[in-house]
């Protein structure tokens, strides 16, 4: 038996297919989902969701949202998502390094709003770079 996974953003459906296993980046840590999982509604952090449609794992960068698990169906509703294979690794690396520098600068200052924004941009850039295979 498999799970039906749908990853939906405000703009499009990023994934709509069967998978064997899912690891979600919830706000309280990673959540593994297999066939027969108990019903669950969880908030998702910006991070990487790993899915196993067959033998190999695939990564999808998620930009925060919610996931609902019920009756072997998993609905992931997020602000943004990109399948790792579609992300250019070198571009993602450059964006990650820039976000890391911006976060370091924001940590030096006393502007709370700037720090919050830099932290969010860092998390997004890290998720994209991880999904592209740039870091584990």
Swiss-Prot record:
It is found in: Cellular thylakoid membrane. Keywords: ATP synthesis, CF(1), Hydrogen ion transport, Ion transport, Membrane, Thylakoid, Transport. It is a peripheral membrane protein. It holds the Pfam family ATP-synt_DE. One of its GO terms (molecular function) is ATP binding. InterPro entries: ATP_synth_F1_dsu/esu, ATP_synth_F1_dsu/esu_N, ATP_synth_F1_esu_C, ATPsynth_dsu/esu_N. GO terms for cellular component: plasma membrane-derived thylakoid membrane; proton-transporting ATP synthase complex. Produces ATP from ADP in the presence of a proton gradient across the membrane. F-type ATPases have 2 components, CF(1) - the catalytic core - and CF(0) - the membrane proton channel. CF(1) has five subunits: alpha(3), beta(3), gamma(1), delta(1), epsilon(1). CF(0) has three main subunits: a, b and c. Belongs to the ATPase epsilon chain family. This is ATP synthase epsilon chain. The gene is atpC.
């Amino acid at each position: 038996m498999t799970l039906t996974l749908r990853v939906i953003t405000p703009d499009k459906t990023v994934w709509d297919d069967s998978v064997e296993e899912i690891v979600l980046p919830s706000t309280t840590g990673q959540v593994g989902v297999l066939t027969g999982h108990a019903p669950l509604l969880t908030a998702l952090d910006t991070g990487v969701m790993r899915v196993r449609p067959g033998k190999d794992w695939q990564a999808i960068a998620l930009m925060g949202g919610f996931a609902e698990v019920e009756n072997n169906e998993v609905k992931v509703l997020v602000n943004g998502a990109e399948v790792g294979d579609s992300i250019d690794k070198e571009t993602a690396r450059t964006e990650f390094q820039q976000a890391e520098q911006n976060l370091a600068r924001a940590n030096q200052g006393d502007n709370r709003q700037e720090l919050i924004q830099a932290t969010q941009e860092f998390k997004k850039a890290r998720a994209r770079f991880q999904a592209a295979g740039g870091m584990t």
